[in-house]
Amino acid sequence: MSNTILQNLPKGQKVGIAFSGGLDTSAALLWMRQKGAVPYAYTANLGQPDEDDYNAIPKKAMAYGAENARLIDCRSQLAHEGIAAIQCGAFHISTGGIPYFNTTPLGRAVTGTMLVAAMKEDDVNIWGDGSTFKGNDIERFYRYGLLTNPNLKIYKPWLDVQFIEELGGRLEMSQFLIENGFDYKMSVEKAYSTDSNMLGATHEAKDLEQLSTGMKIVKPIMGVAFWDEKVEIKPETVTVTFEDGVPVALNGKHFDNAVDLILEANRIGGRHGLGMSDQIENRIIEAKSRGIYEAPGMALLHIAYERLVTGIHNEDTIEQYRINGIRLGRLLYQGRWFDPQALMLRETAQRWVAKAITGTVTLELRRGNDFTILNTESPNLTYEAERLSMEKVEDAPFDPVDRIGQLTMRNLDVSDTRGKLGIYAQTGLLSAIKDSVLPQLGKK
């Protein structure tokens, strides 16, 4: 068995812990200190919409026994990776045409690299976090951690039998903190769990594990419950502007900071409940899970970006963009966002697709994912209404005689296709009988 993963607490050694300030990591930090480890706490500021005071989290970690506690601002890098995902269409999960924007995998890519880099600065080479053995994050963090620090060792309290036996549940952890002089009150248990960052929110587990439980039990944290008729949502006209594949303006207001632009996109999309979806997905270990997702800003930017993609690029380029986007989305989901095969796909899309995406898209947002595209403007559009106008136009790009020639050339492949279908009929793969879908394949 690999010695990269430590199954017992490394006493007397520095142990970095990704500290959220919640019950699990608070109890784990205090427990590790009492058992003889030297815990260092690292908190990622990912612009979580449900976090009010980031500066209070490191102070809390120090109170629980951290040797040192640091707040790492990851927002700029997260915004950069989120925009890269949009440029590449790196989204492989969708239901009814509504994608999951891989917001949690993007957050893990940033957290896993930036926190471990901060640990290296403090000469901390053992890392722990709150991911469980059934989920995706345990593998994502493992990969990103070792990519950043090849000498890293992994210690997870939730894989330590002693920790589980002593503090195996929320009640036990809460009592442990109270017994040690901390006035800890458990939050009201929700019917599901939530994980979020600036790009989106994930709601899953507990009641949401039952497919008979719908989205309506979720209380959105990035927007409104658009399904509730009591919630007033007025139609809103929005413009989104891209330059060289990068979103730069919303409603005519230019942003020099990608973080500020994404936060404003969240506010705009959130007013309508845009980007919420209900997905069944395959986890890395191939078991299926179900999640309810929010990503109002990502959805808004994605809609505008794809509109420009279809108006600017040719059919084969769009096809490769979509196919490669699905492949890249899966690599991102698996924790391989910085692997060579992912970098190759990213480079292709960002260089040859995104660089041409300059323009402004005007939309009307209504409730949920209901929207209308009102206008598409770009100096790079290859869409020209005159080319296929049903009206008579001067200097038409082609005339009826040209089309006759083009259709005549089709005789070659139509003849080949008919021949192949005849072979299939002779071998029994297709039937040429009366009620067949291809009854005319007889030799007459």
Curated annotation (Swiss-Prot):
ATP binds at residues 18-26, 44, 130, 132, 137, 195. L-citrulline binds at residues 100, 136, 140, 193, 202, 204, 281. Gene3D superfamilies: 1.10.287.400, Argininosuccinate synthetase, chain A, domain 2, HUPs. Its main location: cytoplasm. InterPro entries: Arg_succ_synth_type2_subfam, Arginosuc_syn_C, Arginosuc_syn_N, Arginosuc_synth, Arginosuc_synth_CS, Arginosuc_synth_type_1_subfam, AS_cat/multimer_dom_body, AS_multimer_C_tail. GO terms for molecular function: argininosuccinate synthase activity; ATP binding; protein homodimerization activity. It comes from the Bacteria. One of its GO terms (biological process) is urea cycle. L-aspartate binds at residues 132, 136-137. It is found in: Cytoplasm. Its EC number is 6.3.4.5. Pathway: Amino-acid biosynthesis; L-arginine biosynthesis; L-arginine from L-ornithine and carbamoyl phosphate: step 2/3. It catalyses: L-citrulline + L-aspartate + ATP = 2-(N(omega)-L-arginino)succinate + AMP + diphosphate + H(+). Homotetramer. This is Argininosuccinate synthase. It comes from Haemophilus influenzae (strain PittEE).
